[in-house]
UniProtKB/Swiss-Prot annotation:
Residues covered by the DFDF domain: 296-332
Annotated region described as Disordered, given as residue ranges: 79-100, 204-305, 348-426
Alphabetized PANTHER family for the sequence: SCD6 PROTEIN-RELATED, TRAILER HITCH, ISOFORM H
Name of the protein this chain belongs to: Protein sum2
Motif residue range(s): TFG box: 360-380
GO terms assigned for molecular function: mRNA binding; mRNA phosphatase activator activity; translation repressor activity
Pfam family, one: LSM14
Record-linked InterPro entries: DFDF (IPR025762), FDF_dom (IPR019050), FFD_box (IPR025761), Lsm14-like_N (IPR025609), LSM_dom_sf (IPR010920), Sm (IPR047575), TFG_box (IPR025768)
Residue ranges with Low complexity bias: 261-278
């Protein structure tokens, strides 16, 4: 399906709406196809119900992706245009200097009209008119010098084998002609007996390139079989220089020469400064050399003569570890439980109270009474009196019995069962 990419596609969906666009992409994994520059044509009477018909639209969508399962019909209206073949390149031959992909027509080049004479340009450099249609390659501006025919020859004229290869140079301006008056004389002497070339300005090499200086003793080339065209010989030569622009050109050349002289002086100063710096560096380096501190290995570090014995070192380490563990086991473990300072060893009991002295028991009861008062708000159970012994001590026994009744009332208030009160002996 990739060969249909770029074709104009007419697509009808299951909604009976037709779309026309250019096939952009086909995704077989997602079962989708994409169209670009899509136009919506509507249902076009496929609904068979005027109320459900969808009219077309003039809007063009840039990109639409369609699901393949929802496509009802697909038709190719215009196939994809085949791309133009790439231009044929010449072989990689060092003998080829330049090439042109177009076919050269010699007959058309011979009948081509010569370029119009150069019009004076008020801004200095002469400008050129566009060459006629079908003109050869060298008639265009900025053409390489090797494609330019010798001056005075008609365009497209074949050269004889005896014609020497004479490079073509543009007409120099007046100032260059004034500076080199021997140029015209040498050329006329060197090419005596040959038809003079009518040099046309504006073609060939730029004006800032200096022509070669022919020596007077240079042998003249042989005669050529090609003569200059009469129409070109009758054409008056033009130098392309405006008379009124001569002072401005001389002033600009004077400024350029001044700037060149200034730059030359500056370059001389820079060269002298560079020489002075190099001489000063030479003088400094010729003096006594300073020692540069370098990092050298310590000679006192002795290198081991034998390899390290890992087995012996591991045994030694294991013995040291065993000694340390044995010393820790020999030490007395820290005592965390101290009976004299522990809370549970100070709990009062009857056997402990009996073993105490009377003063110790009294102090213990006072402390317990104060703790009870602070904790419960009641001092304690009071004195545990005993019954009086004998009749003579009956009053004391009854008094003790009254204290016993108070103790029972205290226990009843705290939720305990009252004890049976023994009868007082009368």
């Amino acid at each position: 399906m990739t060969e249909f990419i770029g074709s104009r596609i007419s697509l009808i969906s299951k909604s009976d709406i037709r779309y026309v666009g250019i096939l952009q992409d086909i995704n077989s994994q997602d079962s989708t196809l994409a169209l670009k520059h899509v136009r919506w044509c509507g249902t076009e009477g496929r609904k068979q119900d005027p109320s459900q018909e969808i009219p077309p639209s003039d809007n063009v969508f840039d990109y639409i992706v369609f699901r393949g399962s929802d496509v009802k019909d697909l038709r190719i209206e215009e196939p994809a245009t085949t791309p133009s073949a790439p231009p044929v390149q010449p072989p990689n031959d060092p003998a080829i200097i330049g090439s042109n992909s177009g076919q050269y027509n010699w007959n058309q080049a011979q009948t081509a009209q010569p370029p119009q004479p150069v019009q004076p340009n008020p801004y200095g450099a002469p400008y050129q008119q566009a060459p006629p249609a079908g003109a050869p390659y060298y008639m265009y501006p900025n053409a390489p010098a090797q494609f330019v025919p010798p001056g005075g020859l008609p365009l497209g004229t074949p050269l004889d084998a005896s014609t020497p290869a004479v490079p073509y140079y543009g007409a120099p301006d007046q100032q260059q002609m004034g500076q080199r008056p021997e140029f015209a004389q040498n050329v006329s002497q060197g090419f005596a007996g040959q038809a003079p070339y009518n040099v046309r300005p504006g073609y060939g090499m730029p004006s800032n390139q200096k022509p070669p200086n022919f020596a007077p003793g240079m042998p003249a080339p042989g005669p050529t079989a090609v003569s200059a065209s009469p129409s070109l010989q009758s054409m008056p030569p033009t130098n392309g220089v405006i008379p009124g622009a001569q002072p401005s050109i001389e002033a600009s050349i004077e400024k350029e020469s001044t700037s060149i002289r200034n730059s030359t002086v500056t370059n001389d100063r820079v060269v002298n400064t560079t020489v002075d710096v190099s001489q000063s560096q030479t003088v400094e380096t010729s003096g006594p050399s300073k020692e540069v501190p370098t990092t050298q290995p310590d000679a006192s570090a002795a290198k081991p003569r034998t390899e390290f014995d890992f087995q012996t070192a591991n045994q030694k380490f294991q013995s040291m570890k065993d000694d340390l563990l044995k010393g820790k086991n020999d030490e007395e473990a820290e005592e965390f439980y101290k009976p004299k300072q522990s809370f549970f060893d100070n709990i009062s009991c009857e056997s402990k109270e009996k073993g105490m002295e009377a003063a110790d028991r009294r102090a213990l009861r006072d402390r317990e009474r104060s703790l009870n008062m602070e904790t419960f708000g009641v001092a304690g159970s009071g004195n545990r009196g005993r019954r009086g012994r004998g009749r003579g001590r009956g009053g004391r026994g009854r008094g003790r019995g009254y204290a016993r009744n108070q103790y029972n009332q205290y226990r009843n208030s705290n939720g305990s069962q009252p004890r049976a009160q023994p009868a007082n002996d009368q």
